[in-house]
């Protein structure tokens, strides 16, 4: 083991050397014919030819979904979970309004979705997933979804895909201010404030969001029936009661401080610090018959995320380094009145997570035909989990939990080749370390080619192998953790075609169709044991396959009239192909629980002068709640359609830019469930006012 570990560490050392060699060789060649190096909106002008065009060499064969900046700033009340629900083909599983919301690609689980913010992972080292309801859309300036194999370009472990989130400097001159007030149904209030200042070198920004609501919406409880009696106490009829969402209030506060310094000579420095304070009640289930005053079910979280970055850009090469820190303190309390008026602790959970992050990367263009990249990142986690439960042990209370530290290293090198403007090939090799355990090499191959320049028809294909290491809870949670778990592994294949046509100033139409096929072995699932608790096991082989389709249209209809449309559709069978655990096991050959086979979204925006009207629609097919796909009453959740509309008016007096927006959510008052027994709101309204003074 010592020899293998030494060998692998030498491999990472060689990767670091590759980064240094990329930069040193580039310095030696600087002064030759230059190439314009662009990095998003930031670039250095060097005399020469442009190596990036309509098909950037960095994106050879990649299947991705960029989220439009307009969608990110559409509504102050939206989280990234709300944005992705209507703007992508992924499945957003929500436990209710302002509660846990997770994202899953292509029939996989939320822990198979890797999430990065300014390069740093947001996935919980305890659970492996990310709560998108705690990410305000107004705090994100750039968002991109990388599907399947494409996620290997960013990180390992994304068996379904990855989500890349980033902030960006506002590029302002002088002092700027923006304030937004949102008022909605259920006494919901959302406020946003952004202060900024900038000059030729500095960009400073402060953003703050506060969201509060008792969240006591009404709904028809289909899990209960109330009897109607006659005078002789005979049941003559029944009805479903209308109830309020009980114990579902929330208060979320976020503040984001950013500072950027640009030397204008190829170096840029940045600091991003994001603090959140969340206090949320966990609403009672539709099957709860008790009085809400008899319970206190609450989760509190304080998290600080900070990243410092440096970028060094030259004509044909780039280097960067980032360092970061995450501190999370989470508290969960479940209290109950035992009948004497005193609230007693049933569960008292305290979790603390500290993560140290570091990353270096480099890119080097030999010419307009070759790009080489190298990347090495490190996340060092320190986790302390403590749960105080009622234990059957002479009536005493016992404390169980764990304290663990784990380092996670991820290194990758890639070579991208585009010999002409019709063909491209990319190879990525990645390896990761979790504690003392290395994953096998994670390879990925990407290829794309222009089928026809008329219509910009491009074919893409890719293949990769990937691994996901068990989370700390999977390994060490008490009771139930299983230190003998194996890593999940899988092969993923993608193939698709895209097109883009248009006429400048008149219309633009583009779309893509992708087929994917994924085989995942040793799928980890928590199962009940004979000892009365759950424990994770490697039991499933899962075959997830299907198609993804998206299209968008932007057209100028007439003078001052513009129509924008976009839509997504996915068909994602995700089948358990493992062996039966017992003769009674009915899960083999069935769709995985809480994975819709069909999802679809449509967005339309019609603009005229200073008016805008928007319609949003999404659809999820039925989802099974049990691995046996049982059709019993609670065995599946029905399909549902969701429609939202909004009307916006902009005003431009001399002293400020003003925007008024009225939104109707759940336009047709749809009754639906995302998770069994978790109530969801019906039709609701919001008014939003925005002011940006002109200094």
Predicted features by range, described:
Residues 30-73, 110:
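Short, acidic, small-residue-rich periplasmic hinge/interaction motif at the N-terminus
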Residues 197-297:
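Periplasmic-side early beta-strands and strand-to-turn transitions of outer-membrane beta-barrels
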Residues 28, 207, 260-265, 457-461, ...:
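Conserved C-terminal beta-signal and adjacent last beta-strands/turns
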Residues 314-334, 452, 458-460, 487-545, ...:
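Membrane-embedded beta-barrel scaffold of Gram-negative outer-membrane proteins
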Residues 418-424, 515-519, 538-626:
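Gram-negative outer-membrane beta-barrel transporters
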Residues 81-124:
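Extracytoplasmic beta-strand/coil segments of soluble accessory domains associated
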Residues 48, 80-83, 101-104, 116, ...:
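N-terminal periplasmic accessory domains that precede
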Residues 120-148, 479:
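Short acidic/polar hinge/loop motifs at secondary-structure boundaries
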């Amino acid at each position: 083991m010592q020899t293998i570990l030494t060998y692998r560490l030498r491999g990472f050392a060689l990767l670091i050397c590759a980064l240094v060699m990329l930069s040193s060789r580039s310095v030696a060649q600087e002064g030759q014919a230059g190439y314009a190096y662009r990095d998003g909106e930031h670039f250095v002008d060097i005399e020469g030819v442009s190596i990036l065009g309509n098909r950037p060499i960095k994106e050879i064969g990649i299947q991705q979904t960029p989220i439009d900046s307009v969608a990110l700033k559409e509504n102050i009340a939206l989280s990234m979970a709300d944005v992705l629900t209507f703007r992508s083909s992924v499945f957003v599983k929500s436990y209710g309004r302002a509660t846990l919301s997770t994202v899953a690609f292509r029939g996989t689980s939320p822990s198979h979705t890797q999430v990065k913010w300014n390069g740093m992972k947001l996935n919980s080292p305890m659970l492996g997933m990310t709560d998108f309801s705690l990410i305000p859309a107004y705090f994100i300036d750039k968002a991109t979804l990388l599907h399947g194999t494409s996620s290997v370009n960013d990180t390992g472990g994304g068996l379904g895909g990855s989500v890349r989130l980033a902030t960006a400097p506002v590029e302002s001159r002088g002092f700027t201010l923006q304030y937004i007030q949102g008022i909605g149904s259920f006494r919901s209030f959302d406020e946003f404030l952004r202060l900024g200042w900038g000059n030729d070198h500095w960009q400073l920004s402060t953003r703050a969001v506060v969201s509060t609501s008792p969240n006591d919406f009404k709904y028809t409880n289909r899990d209960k029936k109330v009897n109607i009696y006659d005078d002789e106490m005979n049941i003559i009829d029944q009805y479903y009661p209308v109830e309020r969402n009980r114990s579902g209030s929330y208060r979320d506060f976020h503040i984001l401080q950013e500072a950027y310094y640009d030397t204008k000579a190829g170096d840029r420095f940045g600091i991003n610090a994001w603090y959140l304070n969340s206090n949320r009640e966990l609403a009672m289930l539709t099957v709860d018959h008790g009085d809400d005053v008899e319970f206190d079910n609450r989760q509190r979280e304080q998290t600080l995320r900070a990243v410092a970055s440096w970028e060094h850009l030259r004509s044909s090469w780039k280097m960067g380094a980032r360092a970061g820190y995450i501190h999370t303190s989470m508290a969960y309390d479940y209290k109950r009145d035992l009948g004497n008026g005193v609230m007693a602790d049933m569960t008292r959970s305290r979790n603390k997570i500290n993560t140290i992050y570091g990353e270096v990367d480099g890119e080097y263009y030999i010419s307009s035909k070759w790009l080489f990249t190298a990347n090495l990142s490190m996340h060092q986690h320190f986790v302390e989990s403590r749960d105080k439960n009622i234990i059957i042990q002479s009536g005493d209370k016992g404390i169980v939990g764990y304290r663990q530290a784990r380092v996670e290293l991820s290194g990758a090198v890639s070579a991208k080749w585009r010999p002409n403007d019709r063909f491209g090939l990319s190879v990525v090799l990645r390896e990761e370390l979790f504690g003392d355990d290395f994953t096998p090499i994670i390879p990925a191959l990407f290829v794309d080619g222009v089928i026809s320049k008329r219509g910009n028809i491009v074919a893409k294909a890719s293949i990769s192998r990937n691994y996901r290491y068990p989370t700390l809870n999977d390994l060490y949670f008490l009771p139930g953790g299983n230190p003998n778990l194996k890593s999940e592994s899988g092969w993923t294949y993608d193939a698709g075609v895209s097109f883009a046509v248009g006429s400048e100033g008149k219309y633009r139409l583009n779309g893509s169709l992708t087929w994917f096929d994924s085989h995942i072995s040793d799928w980890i699932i928590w199962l009940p044991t004979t000892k009365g608790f759950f424990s994770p096991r490697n039991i499933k082989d899962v075959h997830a396959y299907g198609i993804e389709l998206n299209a968008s249209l932007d057209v100028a209809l007439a003078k001052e009239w513009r129509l924008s449309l976009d839509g997504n559709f996915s068909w994602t069978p995700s089948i358990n192909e493992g062996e039966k655990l017992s003769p009674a096991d009915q899960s083999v050959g069935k769709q995985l629980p809480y994975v819709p086979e069909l999802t679809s979204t449509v967005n339309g925006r019609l603009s005229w002068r200073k008016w805008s009207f928007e319609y949003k629609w999404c659809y999820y097919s039925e989802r099974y709640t049990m691995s046996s796909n049982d059709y019993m009453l609670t065995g599946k959740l029905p399909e549902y359609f969701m429609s939202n509309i909004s009307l916006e008016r902009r005003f431009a007096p001399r002293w400020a830019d003003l925007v008024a927006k009225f939104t109707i959510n759940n336009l047709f008052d749809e009754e639906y469930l995302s998770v069994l027994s978790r109530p969801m709101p019906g039709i609701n309204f919001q008014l939003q006012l925005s002011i940006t003074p002109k200094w």
